[in-house]
Swiss-Prot record:
Gene3D superfamilies: Ribosomal protein S7 domain
Record key words, sorted: Chloroplast, Plastid, Ribonucleoprotein, Ribosomal protein, RNA-binding, rRNA-binding
GO cellular component: chloroplast; small ribosomal subunit
Residues spanning the signal sequence: none
Protein's name according to its UniProt entry: Small ribosomal subunit protein uS7c
Quaternary data: Part of the 30S ribosomal subunit.
Taxon lineage: Eukaryota, Rhodophyta, Bangiophyceae, Bangiales, Bangiaceae
UniProt function note: One of the primary rRNA binding proteins, it binds directly to 16S rRNA where it nucleates assembly of the head domain of the 30S subunit.
Coiled coil: none
GO biological process: translation
InterPro entries referenced in this protein's UniProt entry, alphabetically: Ribosomal_uS7, Ribosomal_uS7_bac/org-type, Ribosomal_uS7_CS, Ribosomal_uS7_dom, Ribosomal_uS7_dom_sf
PROSITE patterns with a match to the protein in the record: RIBOSOMAL_S7 (PS00052)
Amino acid sequence: MSRRNTAKKRFASPDPLYKSRLVSMLTVRILKSGKKTLSQRIIYQALDIVKERTESDPLNILEKAIRNITPLVEVKARRVGGSTYQVPIEVRAYRGTNLALRWITKFSRDRSGKSMSMKLANEIMDAANETGNSIRKREDTHRMAEANKAFAHYRY
């Protein structure tokens, strides 16, 4: 047991334009080499593209996309008697949101195209429409958990 005090959970402050914590969390995920203003510009351009194409509130589209991507269960490796089992565990809300944001940024970076803002906008719209690579990743995660349901009694 650690004798130190436990660290308090710090939550991201809302971004200046949309006043949304979700946008500021996405800003941190896209961040490279501490260039936060560039990261914000990429996100705002992506949300403008989403607004042009869908003619609706881009923040609602982003929230819908995150909701669609957020996994409900995931597998965690657990070593029992010399063999490693993939144990399915439920995902807490904050971790689920973090995973969704991580997957959105990863798969938008992997997309082919010119600008990051265009790739991010396409990934957000695909996720809102329940298509795209990030949705496939969520389904793969759920499939892994379903396949290893037999080891659920090894839960932490």
